[in-house]
Each structure stands twice: as C-alpha cells, then as structure tokens.
C-alpha cells in the first residue's frame, strides 16, 4: 500500500510540480513534451532531496 502511495507522489511531482517549476508554458499533466534531462541538470539535487523527503515521510 505504501509503495502505491509513493508511486502516486512521485508521479504527481513529475507530472505537475516539475513543469510549473521549470516554467513550462502549458504546465500540468498534459505537458508531456518536457525535456527531463534539462530539468535534471537545473534542479537534480533539489528534486532528489524532495523525493527522498517524500519517501521518508511515507516509510517513517
């Protein structure tokens, strides 16, 4: 069950939060043409920390 919740949390981050942070004009789940490599270069460490925090909250 926790794994499912974690998966949804990660998908939410990827589909909604990242496009908004990266300034994608059509931010949201439908903005599929995002260049993830560019985003990871810009905010890789922050994103990894955010995902780690989410995982810790779910497991802890």
UniProtKB/Swiss-Prot annotation:
GO terms for cellular component: extracellular region. Keywords: Amidation, Neurotoxin, Secreted, Signal, Toxin. GO terms for molecular function: toxin activity. Expressed by the venom gland. Residues 24-33 form a propeptide. The modification Glutamine amide is found at residue 59. Residues 1-23 form the signal peptide. The keyword Secreted applies. It is found in: Secreted. Disulfide bonds: none annotated. It comes from the Eukaryota. Belongs to the formicidae venom clade 2 family. Toxin that causes a rapid and irreversible paralysis when intrathoracically injected into insects (blowflies). Does not cause spontaneous nocifensive behaviors by intraplantar injection in mice. This is Myrmicitoxin(1)-Pr4b. It comes from Pogonomyrmex rugosus (Desert harvester ant).
């Amino acid at each position: 069950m926790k794994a499912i919740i974690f998966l949804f949390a990660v998908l939410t981050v990827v589909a909604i939060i990242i496009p908004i942070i990266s300034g994608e004009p059509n931010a949201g789940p439908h903005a599929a043409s995002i260049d993830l490599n560019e985003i990871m270069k810009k905010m890789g460490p922050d994103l990894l920390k955010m995902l780690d925090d989410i995982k810790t909250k779910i497991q802890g």
